[in-house]
C-alpha cells in the first residue's frame, strides 16, 4: 500500500490510493466506483459515508441503499466506528453518525410509501405479502377468471407471478417479456394481461402490496414532479451498493431522486452481475456515466486483499474474454507458488469422492471445515456430494435451499400476525382461519366476506357463528383477535400470544411438533429484536433469513462444519479453500441459459464470482460424464460432457491440470513368453461342418 501524505487524516491513512480517491471524491458530483472482488468495497463505501459525515453532512439526510438488511446494518456499524475513532469517543456523542435512512430499495420504498400513504391513496396500514402469498392470490384470481380450466395448459400460479414480476422490474412490455423469457406462453398474452389487471384489483381491495409493488408504487410516485422534488430534497447524498444487481425500475427510481446526479455515488462490479433471473441488468452500471452531463466520474479499485495472485490471474483471464466490461485486472500482494487446479474426474460419484478427500486432507493439514466451501451453479448439483458427506459423517450446512420463512408452521404463525394487523388481507386470513378444526375454504371465505363489508372487523368476527367442529377453538381465536386488534397491542408480547395460541394447532397438525416448536422459539427471539409489529412484518418479508443462517439455527459456533452453497448465495463471501463443481457445458453455462449473448455472459460472470471467493486454494472439478434420468425416448443413460467454454485452451496455462483418481503405478513385471496365435475364425467355421 502506498504511504499516505503526512497531512492525511488518520481514518484515511489505512486506505490505498484508489480507495482514498473514491472516499474523498467531490461529494456533489456523480461518482461510479468500480470495486473488483475482494478490493475492500464495503470498507471503502463505509469510509466515504463517514467522510461525508465528518465533512459536515447530516447523517439523517444520507440515503444508503444496500442489497440486504444485514449489509445495511453492517455498513451502519462501520460508519459509526470510523466516525467515533476519528473524533474520539467523547467528542462523538450519542448518535453522531447514526444513519436513519439505510436499507434495501424495497425496505426504503415501504417506509416512504407509509409516510406518503395519504397522498398516494394508500392505507397506512397496508401489509406486504411474500412471494408465496402473492402466488396464492394470483391463483385465486386465475381461478375466478376461469383460466385454470383451460384445455391448453395455462401457466401455473408461480409462473404467472414470475411473468408479472419480470414485466414490472424490467419495465418491458408483456409481449417482449413473453417472447424473450416465456415463449411457450406467448399465446396467452391477452389472458395474462386480464389476469394481471385482476390481480392488481384484488391487492388494492385487500390493502396489500406485493414485493414488486414497493418499487412500482415508489417509481410511480416519483413520476409526479412535485413528489420527486419533495422526496429528492430529503437527501443530500444517495449512495448505492451492489449497483450491478439493480433492475430497470430501481435505476429509474434513483435517477428520479437525483436527476442531475448531485450527491449520487454508486458502487459495484460489472464482472459480478449475476441476478438477471430477478430482473437485474448489467446495463445499469455499464451505462451509468453517460446518464449525466458531464459524465459521471469513475474510480476503479483493483487491488485485491482476498486471493493469491495465481488465483487472480486465472480469474482475470476468464472474465477478460467477456464481450463487454470495464477494463479491470485485479492484483494482489499475496504471492503463491500454487496455481488453481482443474481436476478431471470420471463422473459425479468420483467428483464427490475427490472433493471429500481434498477437504479431509486439508483439514488434516490444519484447515478447518468452516474455512472450506463447495460451490455449484444449481442447488441440485450437490446431491451426490451430500450423500458422500453423510456417508463419511462430515457435518455441513447448505445455503441456497429452502428458506426459513417457507416452512409451513412459520408461515402459519406469520399469517395470523399479518391478518390481525390488517384484517382485510384475505390471503393471510384464509390461511389463519383454516388452522381451526372444521374450518375449510368455504367457511373461511364466509368469515372473510363478513369482515370485508364490516365497519369494524372485530365485530364481524364476534358476530359470526362458528361451525360446530370449531366451536371449542373459536373463543380462543376471538380472544387473540381482541388483544392484537387493540390500538396499542404491546410488542413483542403480541407475537408471543400468537405462538401460544398456535401451539395446540401445531401439535394437532404435525407429528414432529417439538422440532417445529423450536423454530417458533427462534422466531420469537427474532421478533424481540424489532421495535414494532409493522417493522417486524416488513423486514422479514423483504429480507428473510435463510434456513441455515444464524437466525434460524445453524450448528453452534464452536462446531466445525463444511459450507455448501449455490454461487448466487456465496456472493460477498470468502473461504480459504473453494471447490467448484460441474465446470462443464450444460451446467456452467446452464443448458437453460444459452439462448442469448447476455445469458452466456452472465454465466461467465457466475464462474468468475465462484473463482474469486477463494483465498488460498481453488479446485475446479470437471466430470466427464453424467447419469441422467427420464430423458425423452432414450431413458436413463450416461451423457458425456466437455469442459466449460469459459475455460478455453488459451487460459489453461494459468491452471494446474490433472486427472483423479491418478492411474495406478505400473509395477516392473518379468518378461512374458509370447502368447500362441489362435485361428478363431477357423474354429467358428468348423463348428458347422
Predicted regions and their residues:
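Helicase P-loop NTPase motor core
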Residues: 31-33, 39-45, 53, 59, ...
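Coupling/switch/interface segments within P-loop NTPase motor domains and analogous charged loops
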Residues: 131-203
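Conserved P-loop NTPase-based nucleic-acid remodeling module centered on helicase motor cores
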Residues: 61-163, 286, 343
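Short glycine-/polar-rich loops that comprise or flank the Walker A/P-loop
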Residues: 57-61, 96-99, 137, 260-263, ...
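Acidic, low-complexity intrinsically disordered tails
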Residues: 1-8, 650-689
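Conserved helicase NTPase motor core
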Residues: 7-37, 44, 63-64, 71-72, ...
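Walker A/P-loop NTP-binding motif
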Residues: 43-58, 78-82, 255-257, 292
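Conserved helicase C-terminal RecA-like lobe
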Residues: 181, 185, 237, 368, ...
Amino acid at each position: 500500500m502506498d504511504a499516505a501524505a503526512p497531512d492525511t487524516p488518520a481514518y484515511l491513512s489505512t486506505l490505498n490510493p484508489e480507495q482514498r480517491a473514491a472516499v474523498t471524491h467531490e461529494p456533489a458530483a456523480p461518482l461510479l466506483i468500480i470495486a473488483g472482488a475482494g478490493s475492500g468495497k464495503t470498507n471503502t463505501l463505509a469510509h466515504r459515508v463517514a467522510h461525508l459525515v465528518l465533512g459536515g453532512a447530516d447523517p439523517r439526510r444520507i440515503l444508503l441503499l444496500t442489497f440486504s438488511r444485514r449489509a445495511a446494518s453492517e455498513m451502519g456499524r462501520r460508519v459509526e466506528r470510523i466516525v467515533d475513532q476519528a473524533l474520539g469517543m467523547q467528542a462523538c456523542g450519542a448518535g453522531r453518525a447514526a444513519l436513519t435512512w439505510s436499507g434495501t430499495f424495497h425496505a426504503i420504498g415501504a417506509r416512504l410509501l407509509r409516510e406518503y400513504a395519504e397522498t398516494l391513496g394508500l392505507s397506512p396500514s397496508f401489509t406486504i405479502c411474500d412471494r408465496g402469498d402473492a402466488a396464492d392470490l394470483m391463483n385465486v384470481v386465475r381461478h375466478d377468471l376461469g383460466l385454470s380450466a383451460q384445455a391448453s395448459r395455462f401457466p401455473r400460479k408461480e409462473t404467472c407471478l414470475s411473468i408479472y414480476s419480470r414485466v414490472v422490474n424490467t419495465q418491458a412490455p408483456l409481449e417482449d417479456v413473453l417472447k424473450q423469457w416465456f415463449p411457450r406462453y406467448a399465446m396467452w398474452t391477452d389472458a395474462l394481461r386480464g389476469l394481471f389487471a385482476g390481480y392488481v384489483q384484488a391487492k388494492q381491495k385487500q390493502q396489500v402490496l406485493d414485493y414488486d409493488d414497493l418499487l412500482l408504487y415508489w417509481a410511480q410516485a416519483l413520476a409526479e414532479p412535485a413528489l420527486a422534488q419533495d422526496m429528492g430534497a430529503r437527501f443530500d447524498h444517495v449512495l448505492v451498493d451492489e449497483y450491478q444487481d439493480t433492475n430497470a425500475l430501481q435505476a429509474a427510481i434513483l435517477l428520479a431522486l437525483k436527476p442531475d446526479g448531485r450527491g449520487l455515488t454508486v458502487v459495484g462490479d460489472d464482472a459480478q452481475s449475476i441476478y438477471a433471473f430477478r430482473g437485474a441488468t448489467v446495463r445499469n452500471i455499464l451505462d451509468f456515466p453517460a446518464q449525466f452531463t458531464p459524465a459521471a466520474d469513475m474510480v476503479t479499485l483493483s487491488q485485491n486483499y482476498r486471493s493469491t495472485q495465481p488465483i487472480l490471474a486465472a480469474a482475470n483471464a476468464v472474465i477478460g474474454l467477456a464481450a463487454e466490461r470495464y477494463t479491470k485486472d485485479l492484483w494482489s500482494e499475496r504471492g503463491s507458488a500454487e496455481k488453481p487446479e482443474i481436476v478431471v474426474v470420471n463422473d459425479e460419484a468420483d467428483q464427490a469422492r475427490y472433493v471429500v478427500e481434498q477437504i479431509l486432507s486439508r483439514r488434516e493439514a490444519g484447515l478447518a471445515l468452516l474455512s472450506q466451501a463447495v460451490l455449484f451453479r444449481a442447488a441440485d448439483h450437490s446431491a451426490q456430494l451430500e450423500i458422500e458427506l453423510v456417508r463419511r459423517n462430515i457435518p455441513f450446512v447448505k445455503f441456497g435451499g429452502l428458506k426459513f420463512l417457507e416452512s409451513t408452521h412459520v408461515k402459519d404463525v406469520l399469517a395470523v400476525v399479518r391478518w390481525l394487523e390488517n384484517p382485510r388481507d384475505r390471503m393471510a386470513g384464509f390461511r389463519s382461519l383454516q388452522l381451526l378444526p372444521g374450518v375449510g375454504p368455504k367457511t373461511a371465505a364466509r368469515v372473510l366476506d363478513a369482515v370485508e363489508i364490516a365497519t369494524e372487523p372485530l365485530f364481524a368476527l364476534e358476530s359470526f357463528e362458528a361451525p360446530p367442529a370449531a366451536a371449542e377453538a373459536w373463543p380462543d381465536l376471538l380472544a387473540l383477535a381482541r388483544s392484537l386488534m387493540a390500538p396499542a397491542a404491546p410488542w413483542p408480547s403480541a407475537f408471543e400470544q400468537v405462538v401460544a395460541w398456535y401451539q395446540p394447532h401445531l401439535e394437532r397438525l404435525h407429528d414432529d411438533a417439538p422440532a417445529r416448536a423450536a423454530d417458533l422459539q427462534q422466531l420469537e427471539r427474532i421478533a424481540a429484536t424489532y421495535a414494532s409489529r409493522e417493522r417486524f412484518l416488513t423486514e422479514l418479508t423483504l429480507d428473510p433469513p435463510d434456513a441455515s443462517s444464524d437466525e434460524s439455527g445453524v450448528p453452534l459456533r464452536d462446531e466445525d462444519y463444511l459450507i455448501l452453497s449455490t454461487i448466487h448465495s456465496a456472493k460477498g463471501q470468502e473461504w480459504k479453500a473453494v471447490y467448484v463443481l460441474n465446470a462443464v457445458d450444460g451446467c456452467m453455462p446452464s443448458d437453460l441459459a444459452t439462448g442469448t449473448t447476455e445469458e452466456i455472459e452472465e454465466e461467465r460472470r457466475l464462474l468468475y464470482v465462484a473463482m474469486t471467493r477463494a483465498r488460498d486454494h481453488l479446485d475446479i472439478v470437471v466430470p466427464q460424464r453424467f447419469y441422467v434420468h427420464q430423458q425423452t425416448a432414450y431413458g436413463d443413460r450416461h451423457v458425456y460432457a466437455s469442459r466449460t467454454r469459459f475455460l478455453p485452451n488459451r487460459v489453461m496455462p494459468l491452471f494446474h491440470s490433472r486427472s483423479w483418481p491418478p492411474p495406478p503405478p505400473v509395477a516392473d513385471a518379468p518378461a512374458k513368453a509370447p502368447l500362441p496365435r489362435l485361428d478363431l475364425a477357423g474354429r467358428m467355421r468348423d463348428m458347422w461342418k
